[in-house]
Swiss-Prot record:
This protein's encoding gene: Polr2A
Organism encoding this protein: Drosophila melanogaster (Fruit fly)
Chain positions recorded as Zn(2+) 2 binding sites: C107, C110, C150, C176
Region (C-terminal domain (CTD)) location: 1579-1881
Residue location of crosslink Glycyl lysine isopeptide (Lys-Gly) (interchain with G-Cter in ubiquitin): K1260
Name of the protein in its database record: DNA-directed RNA polymerase II subunit RPB1
Chain residues that bind Mg(2+) 2: D487, D489
Binding annotation for Mg(2+) 1: D487, D489, D491
Pfam family, any one: RNA_pol_Rpb1_5
Additional record remark: The binding of ribonucleoside triphosphate to the RNA polymerase II transcribing complex probably involves a two-step mechanism. The initial binding seems to occur at the entry (E) site and involves a magnesium ion temporarily coordinated by three conserved aspartate residues of the two largest RNA Pol II subunits. The ribonucleoside triphosphate is transferred by a rotation to the nucleotide addition (A) site for pairing with the template DNA. The catalytic A site involves three conserved aspartate residues of the RNA Pol II largest subunit which permanently coordinate a second magnesium ion.
Length: 1887
């Protein structure tokens, strides 16, 4: 029973959180311990002591007692605070730094601010920092820091501010004029020190007690309090000193009771007892007047205990310990860190209604299912509200109780009482009433959330449907492993059961697995076909795979969408055989088109002569849902963009794509069962010749290595530039050995036959790669550690049994054996070394990337798309104007090609310019009418000209956007594929002329682009913004749908073009980002997830001389930390003019940049004693010395006898382009007259500099010092030598250590120019790359291109070029890191991160220094890092948290304003009046699941018609129509009531299991007859609700008079839907009873059934996915007596008006039944007896026996309904079947066994022989093809009955509809006014 305190009233939302400091008064008022806690003891005589630490007033101590304050027991009493009065104030350790800051801002003596509040600077500060008290204190502190004299005050003269006030003058001015001490903190003490200017006052230093500080702070006025960034109401400065200490309630510090032992008190209690002891000691001593130093000691002690209560890990402070010696856990430690209060208990908690167990695979589940063990299903519950519709079912579950499955655990009454069914309650308690809740067991098709940690991206939690299975593990489909990153080696996963209908609705419509197939991270699928299925698909689709009749029969049984027709076998004689491709074609749903290649496709084939026939069958082509050629593999069924699954998702919607996964697996796996695939040792053995080749290759590699070693020994090896000899040698050896591995691997792979199982797996892509093959068969290859060969471990060898200095391959880790042959011990050892490195790397990387991801998420968690389309953070600051700069979401965009960018002018003109003058061509392309229309009109030519001009200008702007000729763009609406689809749908014959006028095309494209808007609004800025957002899309549309292409290439007809344009618009609208989408979290996950795939350490490029680049995780860290000192800063310097092309000139620039010191060009230096300048001791220098000293220009006597002789390296000098003169010049400039420097000629043999010291004039006379001097001279020369070598810059920029010059390796670094002919040409020009950066200086050098030169040091770019440049730079650097690993992340995520980092105009690092310095709420900041500091800060400044972010709301347990929570719903009270009352008289009789449809909103799937979705803006929420329906823009198929497979039905009814649908657990249960006619009005056709609930999306029962279809309804506004449209006329075969689609005996074909009308199942290319097929009567497993025909099956739902038994028009007893009934008035044409639809068909004619009032129905002659039929319980008397029973009411033609039309098994057949006696097939003579259907007259070539697509075998293809969708055939009929060229739909928008 729940306690009475739990109120049912909803809690108010917390609007904001105010932080502050508890004032002493407040602590006392709050406290329940009068007089404070004074005793350190807890108990006294076995009872808790009053005034002790376990004071009974503070809370409950054990389970038996009650609280003395609130009289609650343990569960009710929250605990109450006490307090301790401290004898002396002490500092609060959390606020001590703040205290010092405040002290430094106010006068030590008079507490006035050191700067007058009236100072204009202060006023400016207050203005600037409004609402940001933290900043205010910082500004004021900076202002006051320098002041040493108190001069505050009101009437102070501001002019005197900077003058020293006269010390003799009386201190006035309101301040006190005292000198201010400087205040310092040491440990827990503050010291004040006066440094005095006046001579008379001595310096003094005193310790400032907390009491003194408290006095100072107490006197700060409220006004100044505010200026100092505090708050007089919530946080006064003096409250930062502790005078009264709150004692936390007992609930916060519970004692642990050990049985038999004493209570173990909590750490906080221990600490508090220390404080009380110290406090009492101090009191006692003070009272007894002890010595001052004793009292000081006591105060210190108290101070220490109070400090360690709060924070016990202060640096430089002893820890407070327990007796056992482990440090106490202070309050700070409780809050901070991952396990702390904030992150451990508030941000993340353990939850109820969850389960966790091991996962195992099950290929027979659909991807959106999860197998749940029965034991778990019996334990987890879902609270279901009892309604009149489910009360019987619930009663049954309650009766079964908890012990049996399915049952229930609890009943929750409407007053909140819980009845536990485990403890056999009284039977009277079990009675249910409407409004009770039953917590029932989990059962099939309940929605749950499935999750695997680590949850790295949103696809790690997805919605699934339960499938209860035996045994104890979760079962899941194999395709789901990739998004979860799961495998079945013991992984465990979690399952969460949502507890409300709203949550379930969200899971179903947003979260369910099929909707997550595509990841926004890289706009490609995350799930593909994997493992054995992939191997099997590749095996099965090979050319030589044939399947016998028996096997085909067997396989088709596993295909739920099979339509009971065997396809034509491809081989008839000697026996019928089908190919694997044929079987696969049956699985492919709908109208899907695709061209891809197989993994082994040779590229040269595309240009070669065989490009059409593909000799190896490697070109995959799927056309119209048929696999025409090609072998499928991972490329077409894997997770790549543009794979079959991706296309299927985009074209046919998530639901079909989801089923497609399952169907592939069931069929293919069952084929694999009799094909088989096993791999053994035999598959790894190659033939002897291959082994010889391998041996040869390895031998050759070893010889090569020996040669290289030889060369290196003899110094013949030329070091590559930039590398030492040793590096060059290592690189060479490594290259030789790696080539050897690859070569042997190649020959090994070649030796494997087509039938090799290992190869089969590699080729299909399911497991393994070529490296694996070569390592298993040929050789394992070189083992590396840290990117180098195995290093020497000890004494110059790797292992003890190799000789010293062995550089050969074996001893340095080359493994020449294969895994098959086995490794030698030393090889094994090296292999283990390499492997160990990999493991360590992975482990370290996981931690690193995990932290990176957490920081990214915390930085961007609350960034969301708002309703104005902008992207903002939680504080409402603008991050982006449109998400991703184009306002589109990442899932629905694809890679497309911009056709115009790369073309040369000539081919551009040839392909895009429409040449009207070429008459022969025109006659071939257009019909005569069009040509006539064109020649008559003058504007036509102008329009075409204008179009051409527009294309040219488009091309120019594209070339500006993509200056390097990049033509791949990411845009919605894949035009090539859509055009292909159109050609299929409308059967475009490319050889016939088209009736589409070019003017029509131009206008159509123009209106289309006017309607594809991202930024609405007509002002200039909005228009410009929209132009920017949609420019690429516009260019793509204009170039693809230019008149020339549309007419000549595609030959689209007028209606095909109209359809295409409408389709593009719809898709474009669908691709827009939804408001409420949390794009920040998405972006963070999309970047964090690829980071886990990067390697941690940086491999240096082997070989070429190039700078080392930091890559991978370390570089990523540098970028997002914005590190000031990157590991490898570097500039890429592009050159201009001659320097770019001429290597010599480029070298000049290089020399000007590279920093050169004297050391770099010096060969050797020496110091000589050479006393005679003229006759030198070095004979080779004699010559040039003579030249110099013949005519000395200085006093030779001053020269020192010591000589520094520097010999320079000629090669390096010329390399650096230096001359001797330059160097001497530099020396002279540096040392001036003090040195004498002479040098020889630049062309001499040796370049020599001779340097001597010049002694000063006066020195030469001091003889006695001379000896010393000599000594000094040579030492001095030494110093000078060292200084010159290292510090003297000869040339270059100091920061740039080395410059590499090379030609660009990649196109991106080449200069791209556009030639005269308009082609792109990449010119390789010299470029320089540097180690070290100094951008400012480099940019100012001549010959440097200032535009393209860039740095990889982000901070530097910011300083030099500003914020916009740095934003681009961050994006470029991130991209470079990702691309190095071949990862692709959609631009929008990178852009969002860059924008978050730069939005405020400075760089915000993604670290605590960036994220926590933002203006976000304190709660959000404290949930990231520095928890306690942030909270203390917030308290000191009295911040308020506005509760707008995600973290804040989660901490408070509220729904954050995001996703579906970022808007409110309004109730339309008007509509409620039309709601259907459920009369109480129904009692329990009205039960079927179908009856659920009566209450409009009773199931989530029915609400859509009332929501704005009807404007088709958010198509992602109504599934199957998702995209196919999209093909009928705005057509009825969009009716959201086709919302999902289950939609009209009760939420868990799944068409795939009619037997188990909850509404019909068995024929025995729940008869549906609302007994009283009083209900009938509820079904009147005008009720707005019934339309929504009619399961048949667009079946004729939508009477046009229903408000939903009224022409004013927004969706159907255009005249097409007026009741006169052919939609409802007899030609509309989709609805005519003769339509073959509706086999009357199959419930699924009844026009009411959801599926039939669900457009996505309608038009499917190979009879797939029309679920109806599964139930057709011919299919053996659905005999008419099977329960799926039971009248309770929802297909006969009474709510569907056409069968509604209770609706007066059908009740046989009701007088209104006469044909003259007013109900049949022409107002409701679809029911009017004159409606040809109903009258022409025999079963509706009033004469038809169906209308007879007698119960002919049950005539025993009708075999179908004979009473013994098992499905009717054999009891004709059973209430359901009384002739009065409404569902057999004669009105319902369905049940008239005598109607010749409707009983295929009945002996009579209608004379027209519409249904051939076999019942299931429909002969071509069926009226379906009768000529009276004007459109498809047999004369029409396109639709001749023989047209293969319409073979009667393809039953669900209603041939009348080009799209094949029975739902909206008239839509596509070319004669339909809806598509007439004047159709309003496409001229003016349907608002």
């Amino acid at each position: 029973m729940s306690t009475p305190t739990d109120s049912k009233a909803p809690l108010r939302q917390v609007k904001r959180v105010q932080f502050g400091i508890l004032s002493p008064d407040e602590i006392r008022r709050m406290s329940v311990t009068e007089g404070g806690v004074q005793f350190a003891e807890t108990m006294e005589g076995g009872r808790p002591k009053l005034g002790g630490l376990m004071d009974p007033r503070q809370g409950v101590i054990d389970r038996t007692s009650r609280c003395q304050t609130c009289a609650g027991n343990m569960t009710e009493c929250p605990g109450h605070f006490g307090h301790i009065d401290l004898a002396k104030p002490v500092f609060h350790i959390g606020f001590i730094t703040k205290t010092i800051k405040i002290l430094r801002c106010v006068c030590f003596y008079c507490s006035k601010m050191l700067v007058s509040p009236h100072n204009p600077k202060i006023k400016e500060i207050v203005m600037k920092s409004r609402g940001q008290p933290r900043k205010r204190l910082a500004y004021v502190y900076d202002l006051c820091k320098g002041k040493t004299i108190c001069e505050g005050g009101e009437d102070m003269d501001l002019t005197k501010e900077n003058q020293q006030p006269d010390p003799n003058k009386k201190p006035g001015h309101g301040g006190c004029g005292h000198y201010q001490p400087s205040i310092r903190r040491t440990g827990l003490d503050l010291t004040a020190e006066w440094k005095h200017q006046n001579e008379d006052s001595q310096e003094k230093k005193i310790v400032v007690s907390a009491e003194r500080v408290w006095e100072i702070l107490k006197h700060i006025t409220d006004e100044e309090c505010f200026i100092l960034g505090m708050d007089p109401k919530y946080a006064r400065p003096d409250w930062m000193i502790v005078t009264v200490l709150p004692v936390p309630p007992l609930a916060v510090r519970p004692a642990v009771v050990m049985f038999g032992a004493a209570k173990n008190q909590d750490d906080l209690t221990h600490k508090l007892s220390d404080i009380i002891k110290a406090n009492n000691e101090l009191r006692k001593n003070e009272a007894s007047g002890a010595a001052a130093h004793v009292i000081q000691e006591n105060i210190k002690m108290l101070q220490f205990h109070v400090a360690t209560l709060v924070d016990n890990d202060m640096p430089g402070m002893p820890r407070a310990m327990q007796k056992s010696g482990k440090p106490l856990k202070a309050i700070k430690a409780r809050l901070k860190g991952k396990e702390g209060r904030i992150r451990g208990n508030l941000m993340g908690k353990r939850v109820d209604f969850s389960a966790r167990t091991v996962i195992t695979p099950d290929p027979n589940l659909r991807i959106d299912q999860v197998g749940v063990p029965r034991s778990i299903a019996q334990n987890l519950t879902f609270p279901e509200l009892v309604t009149p519709f489910n009360i019987d079912r619930m009663q049954e579950l309650v009766r079964r109780g908890n012990s049996q499955y399915p049952g229930a655990k609890y009943i929750v009454r409407d007053n909140g009482e819980r009845i536990d069914l485990r403890f056999h309650p009284k039977s009277s308690d079990l009675h249910l009433q409407c409004g009770y809740k039953v917590e029932r067991h989990l059962r099939d098709d309940d929605l749950v959330i499935f999750n695997r940690q680590p949850t790295l991206h949103k696809m790690s939690m997805m919605g699934h449907r339960v499938k209860v299975l035996p045994w104890s593990t979760f079962r899941m489909n194999l395709s789901c492993t990739s998004p979860y990153n799961a495998d079945f080696d013991g992984d465990e996963m979690n399952l969460h059961v949502p507890q409300s209908m709203e949550t379930r609705a969200e899971v179903e419509n947003i979260h369910i697995t099929p909707r997550q197939i595509i990841t926004p991270q890289a706009n490609k699928p995350v799930m593909g076909i994997v493992q054995d299925t992939l191997t099997a698909v590749r095996k099965m689709t090979k050319r030589d795979v044939f399947i016998t009749r028996e096997q085909v029969m067997n396989l088709l049984m596993f295909l739920p969408t099979w339509d009971a027709k065997m396809p034509q076998p491809c081989i008839l004689k000697p026996r019928p055989l089908w190919t694997g491709k044929q079987i696969f074609s049956l699985i492919i749903p709908g109208n899907v088109n695709m061209i891809r290649t197989h993994s082994t496709h040779p590229d040269e084939e595309d240009e070669g002569p065989y490009k059409w026939i593909s000799p190896g069958d490697t070109k995959v082509m799927v056309e119209h849902g048929e696999l025409i050629m090609g072998i499928l593999c991972k490329k077409s069924l894997g997770t790549s963009a543009g794979s079959l699954l991706h296309i299927c998702f985009l074209e046919l919607g998530h639901d079909i794509a989801g089923r497609f996964y399952g169907n592939i697996q069931t069929v293919i796996n069952n084929w694999l069962l009799f094909e088989g695939h096993s791999i053994g040792i035999g598959d790894t053995i190659a033939d002897p010749q291959t082994y010889n080749e391998i041996q040869q290759a390895i031998k050759k590699a070893k010889d090569d290595v020996i040669n290289v070693i030889q060369k290196a020994h003899n110094m013949e090896l030329e070091p590559t530039p930039g590398n030492t000899l040793r590096q060059t040698f290592e690189n060479k050896v490594n290259r030789i050995l790696n080539d050897a591995r690859d070569k042997t691997g190649g020959s090994a792979k070649k030796s494997l036959t087509e039938y090799n199982n290992l190869k089969a797996m590699v080729v299909s892509g399911s497991k393994g790669s070529n490296i694996n093959i070569s390592q298993v068969i040929a050789c394992v290859g070189q083992q590396n550690v840290e990117g180098k060969r195995i290093p020497y471990g000890f004494r110059k060898r790797t292992l003890p049994h190799f000789i010293k200095d062995d550089y050969g391959p074996e001893s340095r880790g080359f493994v020449e054996n294969s895994y098959l042959a086995g490794l030698t011990p030393s090889e094994f050892y090296f292999h283990a070394m390499g492997g160990r490195e990999g493991l360590i790397d992975t482990a370290v990387k996981t931690a690193e990337t995990g932290y990176i991801q957490r920081r990214l998420i915390k930085a961007m968690e609350s960034v969301m798309v708002n309703y104005d389309g902008t992207v903002r953070n939680s504080v409402g600051q603008l991050i982006q104007l449109r998400y991703g700069e184009d306002g589109l979401c990442g899932e629905l965009v694809e890679f497309q090609n911009m056709p115009t960018v790369k073309l040369s002018n000539k081919s551009f003109e040839k392909r895009f310019k429409f040449d009207w003058s070429n008459e022969r061509l025109m006659k071939k392309v257009f019909t005569d009418d069009v040509i006539k229309e064109m020649t008559d009109s003058s504007e036509a030519i102008q329009e075409l000209e204008a179009e051409w001009d527009r294309l040219v200008s488009d091309r120019d702007s594209l070339r500006q956007i993509f200056p390097n000729g990049e033509s791949k763009v990411v845009l919605p609406c894949n035009l090539q594929r859509m055009i292909w689809n159109v050609q299929k749908i409308f059967h475009i014959n490319k050889r016939l002329p088209t009736d589409l006028s070019p003017i029509r095309v131009i206008k159509g494209v123009k209106t289309l682009l006017e309607r594809c808007v991202i930024v609405t609004g007509n002002d200039r800025i909005s228009k410009q913004a929209n132009e920017n957002a949609t420019l690429l899309f516009q260019c793509l549309i204009r170039s693809t749908l230019c008149t020339k292409y549309v007419s000549e290439e595609f030959r689209l007809s007028t209606e095909a073009f109209e359809w295409l344009v409408g389709e593009i618009e719809t898709r474009f609208q669908q691709a827009q980002a939804n408001p409420g989408e949390m794009v920040g979290a998405l972006a963070a996950q999309s970047l964090g997830e690829p980071a886990t795939q990067m390697t941690l350490n940086t491999f240096h490029f082997a070989g070429v001389s190039s700078k080392n680049v930091t890559l991978g995780v370390p570089r990523l860290k540098e970028i997002i930390n914005i590190s000031k000192k990157p590991k490898a800063p570097s500039l890429t310097v592009f050159l201009t003019g001659g320097a770019a092309r001429d290597a010599e000139k480029a070298k000049n620039v290089l020399c000007r940049l590279e920093h050169t010191t004297l050391r770099k060009v010096t060969a050797n230096t020496a110091i000589y004693y050479d006393p005679d300048p003229q006759r030198t001791v070095i004979s080779e220098d004699q010559e040039f010395v003579n030249v110099y000293y013949e005519m000395p220009d200085f006093d030779p006597t001053r020269i020192s006898p010591w000589l520094l002789r520097i010999e320079l390296d000629r090669k390096r000098m010329t390399d650096k382009k230096l001359t001797m003169e330059q160097i001497a010049e530099k020396i002279n400039v540096g040392f001036g007259e003090d040195l004498n420097c002479i040098f020889n000629d630049d062309n001499a043999d040796k370049l020599v500099l001779r340097i001597r010291i010049m002694n000063n004039e006066e020195n030469k006379f001091q003889d006695e010092d001379e000896a010393v001097d000599k000594m000094e001279d040579d030492m001095f020369l030494r110093c000078i030598e060292a200084n010159m070598l290292s510090d003297m810059t000869l040339q270059g920029i100091e920061a740039i250590g080395k410059v590499y010059m090379h030609l660009p390796q990649t196109d991106s670094k080449k200069r791209i120019v556009i030639t005269e002919t308009g082609e792109f040409k990449a010119i390789g020009e010299w470029l320089l790359e540097t180690d070290g950066t100094s951008m400012m200086k480099v940019l100012s050098e001549r010959d440097v291109d200032p535009i393209r030169t860039s740095s990889n040091d982000i901070c530097e770019i910011f300083q030099v070029l500003g914020i916009e440049a740095v934003r681009k730079s961050v994006e470029k650097e991130m991209n470079a890191v990702l691309q190095f690993y071949g990862l692709y992340v959609n631009y929008r995520h990178l852009a969002l991160l860059c924008d978050v980092m730069t939005a405020k105009g400075h760089l915000m690092a993604i670290t605590r220094h960036g994220i926590n310095r933002q203006d976000t709420g304190a709660l959000m900041r404290c949930s990231f890092e520095e928890t306690v500091d942030v909270l203390m800060d917030a308290a000191a400044h009295a911040e308020t948290d506005p509760m707008r972010g995600v973290s804040e709301n989660i901490i408070m347990g509220q729904l954050p304003k995001m996703g579906t929570g970022c808007f409110d719903l309004l109730l339309d009270a008007e509509k409620c009046r039309f709601g259907i009352e459920i009369p109480n008289t129904l009692g329990n009789s009205m039960l079927g699941g179908a009856a659920m449809f009566i209450g409009g909103g009773s199931t989530p799937s029915m609400t859509p018609p009332m929501t704005p979705w009807a404007n088709c803006n958010t198509p992602r929420y109504f599934s199957p129509p998702g995209h196919v329906s999209a093909m009928t823009p705005g057509g009825p198929s969009f009716s959201p009531s086709a919302a999902s497979d289950a939609s009209g039905m009760s939420p868990s009814w799944s068409p795939a299991h009619p037997g188990s649908s909850p509404s019909s657990p068995g024929p025995s249960m729940s008869p549906y007859f609302p007994a009283s006619p009083s209900v009938s009005p509820s079904y009147s056709p005008t009720s707005p609700n019934y339309t929504a609930s009619s399961p048949g999306g667009a079946s004729p029962n939508y009477s046009p008079s229903s408000p939903n279809y009224s022409p004013t309804s927004p969706l159907y506004a255009s005249p097409r839907y007026a009741s006169t449209t052919p939609n409802f006329n007899p030609q509309s075969t989709g609805y005519s009873p003769s339509s073959s689609g509706y086999s009357p005996t199959s419930p699924v074909y009844s026009p009411t059934v959801q599926f039939q009308s669900s457009p996505s199942f309608a038009g499917s290319g190979s009879n797939i996915y029309s679920p109806g097929n599964a139930y057709s009567p011919s299919s053996s497993n659905y005999s008419p007596n099977s329960p799926s025909y039971s009248p309770t099956s929802p297909s006969y739902s009474p709510s569907s008006p056409s069968y509604s038994p209770t609706s007066p028009c059908y009740s046989p007893t009701s007088p209104s039944y006469s044909p003259t009934s007013p109900n049949y008035t022409p107002v409701t044409p679809s029911y009017s007896p004159t409606s040809p639809n109903y009258s022409a068909s025999p079963q509706y004619s009033p004469a038809s026996p169906a209308y007879s009032q007698t119960g002919v129905k049950y005539s025993p002659t009708s075999p179908t309904y004979s009473p013994p039929s098992p499905s009717y319980d054999g009891s004709p008397g059973s209430p359901q079947y009384t002739p009065g029973s409404p569902q057999y009411s004669p009105a319902s033609p369905k049940y008239s066994p005598t109607s010749p039309l409707y009983s295929p098994s009945s002996p009579q057949h209608s004379p027209s022989n519409q249904y051939s006696p076999t019942g299931s097939t429909y002969s071509a003579t069926s009226p379906r093809y009768s000529p009276n259907m004007s459109i498809y007259s047999p004369s029409s070539t396109k639709y001749s009955p023989t047209s293969p697509t319409y073979t009667p075998t393809a039953r669900n293809y209603s041939p009348t509809s080009p799209m094949y969708s029975p739902t909206a055939p008239s839509h596509y009929s070319p004669t339909s006014p809806a598509y007439s060229p004047s159709s309003p739909t496409f001229e003016e928008s349907e608002d």
